[in-house]
């Protein structure tokens, strides 16, 4: 069973960046799940507030929320960050912007998903080859029978 805890941070003009990092002392899989990003009630009217995420492990640096008082006060990105340090930064606006979600520590060891995907692809390719061969054989048999039936 996984250990789950609440994660919440506030970004403002004075404190515009926060970083979440995996617990090095925890040997099993960890992930951060961001469920919602909210614009605070004190936010200035007609000011865009843009939150950017940066994951150095995957070289990702992209805005994940654009909020504006009077228009969009909340987004539900439902994004997950596995085994990677993540930095959230308020790159435009003065906030406050609230980010919350879950920090999940698995009891099961994390397996490299890319290796599993490659193994699955190979197995699927092998399965796909056999039906195609059977179909060709069946079609060839049908074709011969059809010609023989026409000659009679």
UniProtKB/Swiss-Prot annotation:
UniProt protein name: Nucleoplasmin-like protein
Marked site, Interaction between pentamers, at 45, 68
Location of the protein in the cell? Nucleus
What organism is this sequence from? Drosophila melanogaster
Q: How does it assemble?
A: Decamer formed by two pentameric rings associated in a head-to-head fashion.
Q: What does this protein do?
A: Binds to core histones and functions in the ATP-facilitated assembly of approximately regularly spaced nucleosomal arrays. May participate in parallel with other histone-binding proteins such as NAP-1.
What gene name does this entry carry?
Nlp
Asked if the record carries the keyword Nucleus, the reply is yes
Biased segments, Basic and acidic residues type: 136-145
Q: What are the protein's UniProt keywords?
A: Nucleus
Source species taxonomy: Eukaryota, Metazoa, Ecdysozoa, Arthropoda, Hexapoda
Its Gene Ontology cellular component terms are: cytoplasm; nucleolus; nucleoplasm; nucleus
């Amino acid at each position: 069973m996984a250990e789950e805890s609440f994660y919440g941070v506030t970004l403002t003009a004075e404190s515009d960046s926060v970083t979440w990092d995996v617990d090095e002392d925890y040997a099993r899989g960890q992930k951060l799940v961001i469920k919602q990003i909210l614009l605070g009630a004190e936010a200035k009217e007609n000011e865009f507030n843009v939150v950017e995420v940066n994951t150095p492990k995957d070289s990702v640096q992209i805005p994940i929320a654009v909020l504006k008082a009077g228009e969009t006060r909340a987004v539900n990105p439902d994004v997950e960050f596995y085994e990677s340090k993540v930095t959230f930064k308020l790159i435009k606006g003065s906030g406050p912007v609230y980010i919350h979600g879950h920090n999940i520590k698995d009891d099961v060891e994390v397996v490299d998903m890319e290796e599993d995907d490659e193994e699955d692809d190979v197995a699927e390719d092998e399965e796909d080859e056999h039906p195609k061969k059977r179909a060709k054989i069946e079609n060839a048999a049908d074709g011969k029978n059809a010609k023989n039936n026409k000659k009679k």
